[in-house]
Amino acid sequence: MACGATLKRTLDFDPLLSPASPKRRRCAPLSAPTSAAASPSSAAAATAASFSAAAASPQKYLRMEPSPFGDVSSRLTTEQILYNIKQEYKRMQKRRHLETSFQQTDPCCTSDAQPHAFLLSGPASPGTPSATSSPLKKEQPLFTLRQVGMICERLLKEREEKVREEYEEILNTKLAEQYDAFVKFTHDQIMRRYGEQPASYVS
């Protein structure tokens, strides 16, 4: 006659009152013991696989970094551009004043300096006196100060965009050269180390 006894679990193993999970832990599978030194064929296959993966995905090696010009703002503000234009205009006026005073004090150089004064002031109209007779006359400006500032700002932006494009092109070229050198170096190392060994079924 067979009899069986049932054991009642204590509260520690009750799934409702136990803080731990009621599920049993799975046994971790025993890993097969690996040899201390791998066979040359397997090492060659692993190296060849890594080489093929690197050669097949150049974009992974040449990952596109964010452009260093992305967070760079314009160094010159509109107010600074206008201030520089004003200072340059004052220097030009002072230079013209010095040239006219030099011509008045030294009459022998008047004939030599006449073409230069003609270029600065432009040809005189028939109804007005010549530029040499009235060098300090007020000229009619072609552009306002704000218009000149807008022109200079636009030229600076165009120049900045051109420099940015040249930098990106040079950077991509250098990265491509580095990648080609990396591929060639890896291929030479594989051929030097495993080139003379016979091919196995793994490769």
Swiss-Prot record:
A motif (Nuclear localization signal) lies at residues 22-27. Polyubiquitinated. Polyubiquitination is dependent of UBR5 that extends pre-ubiquitinated AKIRIN2. GO terms for molecular function: protein-macromolecule adaptor activity; transcription coregulator activity. The keyword Repressor applies. A motif (SYVS motif) lies at residues 200-203. It is found in: Nucleus; Cytoplasm; Membrane. The modification Phosphoserine is found at residues 18, 21, 57. Widely expressed. Most abundant in the lung, followed by the skeletal muscle, heart, liver, fat, thymus, lymph node, small intestine, kidney and spleen. In skeletal muscle, expressed at higher level in fast extensor digitorum longus (EDL) and longissimus lumborum (LL) muscles than in slow soleus (SOL) muscles. Its main location: nucleus. One of its GO terms (biological process) is protein import into nucleus. Keywords: Adaptive immunity, Cytoplasm, Developmental protein, Immunity, Innate immunity, Membrane, Nucleus, Phosphoprotein, Protein transport, Repressor, Transcription, Transcription regulation, Transport, Ubl conjugation. GO terms for cellular component: chromatin; cytoplasm; membrane; nucleus. It comes from the Eukaryota. Molecular adapter that acts as a bridge between a variety of multiprotein complexes, and which is involved in embryonic development, immunity, myogenesis and brain development. Plays a key role in nuclear protein degradation by promoting import of proteasomes into the nucleus: directly binds to fully assembled 20S proteasomes at one end and to nuclear import receptor IPO9 at the other end, bridging them together and mediating the import of pre-assembled proteasome complexes through the nuclear pore. Belongs to the akirin family. Homodimer. Interacts with IPO9; the interaction is direct. Associates with 20S and 26S proteasomes. Interacts with SMARCD1; promoting SWI/SNF complex recruitment. Interacts with NFKBIZ. Interacts with YWHAB. This is Akirin-2. It comes from Sus scrofa.
